[in-house]
Amino acid sequence: MKELLDIIFPTLSDELIIVISLIIGLLVTASLILFLVKKISPKTNISELSARTRSWWIMAGMFIGAVFISYNISYFFLAFLSFIAFRELYSVLGFREADRGALFWGILAIPIQYYLAYLAWYGAFIIFIPVVMFLVLPLRLVLKGDTHGITKSMALLQWILMLSVFGISHLAYLLSLPELPGFNAGGRGLLLFLVFLTEINDVMQFIWGKLLGRHKILPKVSPNKTWEGFLGGVISTTCLLYTSPSPRDMRRSRMPSSA
C-alpha cells in the first residue's frame, strides 16, 4: 500500500502515506470480510455493518480528497459540514418564528469562524462563538420583542453553534497549525489521523457492542448503542492512540543526538 501511494503521490511525506494507508487498509479489510461473510453465509444479516462500511468509504474519500486537492477546499468542505449539522439540528429541535433573525446570525457565524481558523488567529478563534456569539444572539432575540419561550431559544441556539460549528471548526484549525520539525505531515496528517481514530472507534464500538452489549444507553434514541460497546470503543481507541507514534515522538526520534 505504501509503495503504491508513493507512486501515485510522490510528493507526500512518509507520515501522510502511513495515515492514508491505515485508513484505506482498514476499509479494504472490512469490505473483504463483508464479501466473504456474504459468500460463506448468505443468510447472515450484515446490513448494518455494510451500511457503516459504505458510509466510511464515502466519508474517508471526501476527507482525503478535500485535504489533498486544496487547503482552501478543505476549509470550505468543513464549513459546509458545519452548515449541514447546524441546519439538521435546527430542523429537528424546532424554533419560533421570532427566532429566524437570530438563526440567520448563527449561520453568518460559520464563515467567520472558519476564516479565523484559516488565519490561525487562535485568540479570536477560541472566543468568537463561546463569548461573542453568546452575547450577540441573546441580544438579537431580546430586540425582537417576543419573550415567550425566549430562554429555550437562547439555550438551543447557543449550543447548536457550539456543537455544529465551534466543535467541528477545530478540525479546520488543525490544517492551520505550523509544521513541527521532524513531522512533515503537518495539519493534514493530524486531521487524517483523527479521521482514522474515529473510524477505529466506530468499528470497535460495533464489535464490543455485539460481543458484550447488554445495557442500552438511549433505547428510544439509538437502540443499538450499549454501554459495553461505548466503553470498549473508547478504551480500545485510547490504547491505540497511546501506543501510536505522536508528532512529538516522531520529532524526537529524528532530532540529532547531543552526543
Model-derived segments and spans:
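Cytosolic, membrane-interface loops and tails of multi-pass inner-membrane proteins
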Residues: 35-45, 204-225
